[in-house]
Swiss-Prot record:
The keyword Membrane does not apply. HAMAP family: Nucleos_phosphorylase_PpnP (MF_01537). CDD domains: cupin_PpnP-like. GO terms for molecular function: guanosine phosphorylase activity; purine-nucleoside phosphorylase activity; thymidine phosphorylase activity; uridine phosphorylase activity. One of its GO terms (cellular component) is cytosol. It comes from Marinobacter nauticus (strain ATCC 700491 / DSM 11845 / VT8). This is Pyrimidine/purine nucleoside phosphorylase. InterPro entries: Ppnp (IPR009664), RmlC-like_jellyroll (IPR014710), RmlC_Cupin_sf (IPR011051). It holds the Pfam family Ppnp. Its EC number is 2.4.2.1, 2.4.2.2. It comes from the Bacteria. It catalyses: a purine D-ribonucleoside + phosphate = a purine nucleobase + alpha-D-ribose 1-phosphate; adenosine + phosphate = alpha-D-ribose 1-phosphate + adenine; cytidine + phosphate = cytosine + alpha-D-ribose 1-phosphate; guanosine + phosphate = alpha-D-ribose 1-phosphate + guanine. Belongs to the nucleoside phosphorylase PpnP family.
Length: 93
């Protein structure tokens, strides 16, 4: 079954589903800057657009474009910002 999630007053929306290997969400982040928390390891892949992130323990922001991925450990938080709508796929575990 699909579960729709909405965060930051509707500026981030995702649909949760079970991929062939791991639980996942696919969603869109609207222009802005956000801070996300993780409960378990997440691998985030940019599908369309560009996402600039500040990963835990890092001092420099990194930019990821379509087809690029980054990982965040569980029980952590990271910041993300974008200038335009950006689509992503996130797998958990």
């Amino acid at each position: 079954m699909l579960t729709v999630n909405e965060y930051f007053d509707g500026k981030v929306k995702s649909v949760a589903f079970q991929s062939s290997t791991l639980p996942a969400t696919i969603g869109v982040i609207s222009a802005g800057e956000y801070e996300f928390g993780t409960s378990e390891k997440e691998t985030m892949t940019v599908v369309s657009g560009e996402l600039t992130v500040l990963l835990p323990g890092q001092q420099d922001w990194q930019t990821f474009g379509a087809g690029e991925s980054f990982e965040v450990a569980g029980q952590a938080s990271f910041k993300a910002k974008t200038d335009a709508d950006t689509a992503y796929l996130c797998t958990y575990g």
